[in-house]
């Protein structure tokens, strides 16, 4: 999995760049879905980064809670609040200290590509926090989500990287399920209920479907209607990084599936779309 999170701020100028999406429905992405993935999937994983890596919390030296709102015209809106070395994301920008507006989903996606430099419409006085804390934090996240081979030789780094990748992919599944045309079609075939994505003896996430709308809960599911269980964290990481195939893992028993086949089948279809967005 490759995810870009190179964010730059410049108080004197702003530059933007965009790429035109082209191709067929099943092999290309749309900018609106990508914006939802980038905000809730990628930047939303900052919550988990701060919880897993002490170096992340050390970057957050603000003594009072400080919140950054991201408002995308025709797209998502969310606020990340930083407090006591941790952070929390919530939908909406009604209560934020710093607001970063984007005129389109394409412009917001450029933020994470490093090709768009945003200018705050509110809270310009907090530019120091953006430069000294937020940007280094996103750089650290990018290091884990786009790891160098040498870094992955460190077992501790590899474990954190895999966990963050799992959380990012799990949230991306819901965004694709709700916004991507092909994903919406697959979600329309999934009955109400919880789908568990678990790692044996380790972490787990829940995909909750209600009225053909999906949300991701970053916690294990006690009573799922369907479940996908990885034998260990390493297998989960290999699958999400595209190093092994799901079918091969199912055949050798490193991934177990149970419950309603229809739910698992359609989630796998959505996961295929996720891999294209995060490639």
Regions inferred by a protein language model and the residue ranges of each:
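Feature captures hydrophobic
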Residues: 4-9, 15-279
């Amino acid at each position: 999995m490759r995810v870009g999170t190179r964010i730059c701020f410049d108080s004197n100028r702003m530059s933007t760049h965009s790429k035109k999406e082209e191709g067929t429905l099943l092999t290309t992405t749309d900018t609106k879905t990508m914006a939802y993935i980038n905000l809730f999937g990628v930047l939303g994983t900052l919550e988990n980064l701060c919880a897993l890596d002490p170096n992340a919390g050390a970057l957050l030296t603000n003594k009072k809670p400080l919140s950054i709102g991201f408002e995308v015209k025709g797209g998502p809106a969310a606020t990340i609040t930083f407090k006591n070395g941790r952070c929390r994301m919530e939908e909406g920008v009604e209560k934020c200290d710093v607001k970063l507006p984007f005129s389109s989903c394409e412009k917001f996606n450029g933020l994470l590509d490093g090709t768009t430099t945003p200018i705050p419409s509110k809270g310009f006085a907090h530019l120091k926090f953006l430069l000294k804390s937020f940007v280094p934090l996103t750089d650290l996240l990018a290091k884990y989500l786009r790891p160098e081979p040498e870094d992955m030789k460190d077992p501790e780094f590899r474990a954190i990287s895999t966990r963050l990748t799992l959380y990012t992919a799990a949230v991306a599944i819901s965004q694709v399920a709700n916004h991507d045309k092909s994903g919406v079609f697959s979600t329309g075939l999934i009955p109400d209920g919880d789908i568990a994505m678990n790692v044996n003896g380790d972490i787990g996430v829940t995909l909750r479907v209600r009225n053909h709308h999906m949300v991701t809960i970053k916690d294990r599911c006690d009573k799922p209607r369907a479940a996908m269980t990885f034998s260990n964290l390493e297998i989960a990481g290999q699958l999400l990084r595209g190093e092994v195939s799901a079918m091969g893992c199912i055949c050798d028993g490193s991934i177990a599936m149970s419950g309603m086949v229809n739910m698992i089948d359609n989630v796998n279809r959505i996961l295929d779309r996720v891999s294209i967005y995060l490639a």
